[in-house]
Amino acid sequence: MARFNHLKGVFGLLPTPYQADYEIHIPDLKAVAEFCCSSGQHGIVWPVMVGEFYFLGEEERLRGLDAVLEQVNGRLPVVFGCSGVSLSQVLLFARAAQTAGADSIIAMAPARTNAALAIEMYKRMADVYDGPIMVQNADAYAPLTGEQIAQLVEDVPSIEYIKEERQPGPKHIAEVYDLVGDKVKTIFGGAAGKFLPDELLRGADGCMPACEVADVLTKIMEIWWTGDQEAARELHRRLLPLILLETHPMMRYVLQQRGVFSNTIGRTPDGAQALNAGDKAEIARAFKYIEGDLNGYPFKAE
């Protein structure tokens, strides 16, 4: 089944776009998948927290997977987010990923469960999906200890990747790397890429940020791989003011201003995170520091 032997690098997380009637905007979902491909990112993940998986119905989520796979057409690995409200729903999504041909699957345990259920979930995912599995280890979703992850990797050979996002991220990445760094292919960090250089020093070789400026994070990663850590850090310092502004409204706005999304509609009110003129002006100022490092799709300030 595997089209890609080793997943690493920057895997852009797709925000879910919506129409005026709050249905998934399939053309925009395809457009953001194309953006990841065309801007040089190393992989695609949908839907996880950035894609607001908790707002998506089962059927529309599977239609979205089909749309992303169709648009990508094998150019990048596509990781399907299988997190759900129950173990049975997680397994439904894992089976669907098997049928659709997703390159990998990722999941967190359902909310308000515990580590025992999380461990059982990953074992049962391996029963219904024969590709590589990613453990997503996050604070609010029955997180596993490093020792539990090590035992799980031993028990489930198809667990080849870990996304470690217990906070503080770099410290926990180091813990997991010390225990399973020679047993899994890649440890991914998260946190929007805010701590990327430190995560890389501690054992990560991948990052899963929201995709709206992940082309710049990709450039940072690739510079790091050449061995020029100071140049990578210099670009990261210039990007940091922008990613510190990241919210769901900001992601959608940036994708709209980069010509990817046709609107900024979400399924929940933006509330206090709604962007006003001052917010948009600050985003535009932050883009000035990295505008020469974008891989196409220039940002158009209002």
Identify the role of each PLM range.
Residues 1-5, 299-302:
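Basic/polar N-terminal segments that are highly enriched at the extreme N-terminus
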Residues 3-142:
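Active-site beta->alpha loop and helix N-cap motifs at the rims of alpha/beta catalytic domains
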Residues 11-16, 39-40, 200-204, 211-302:
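C-terminal alpha-helical cap/extension of soluble enzyme domains
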Residues 29, 65, 90, 122, ...:
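A general structural signal for well-ordered alpha-helical segments in protein cores
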Residues 56-59, 116-121, 146-148, 201, ...:
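Short secondary-structure transition/capping segments
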Residues 70-76, 100-101, 129-131, 154-158, ...:
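Short helix-capping segments at alpha-helix termini
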Residues 139-247:
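Catalytic alpha/beta core domains of metabolic enzymes, predominantly
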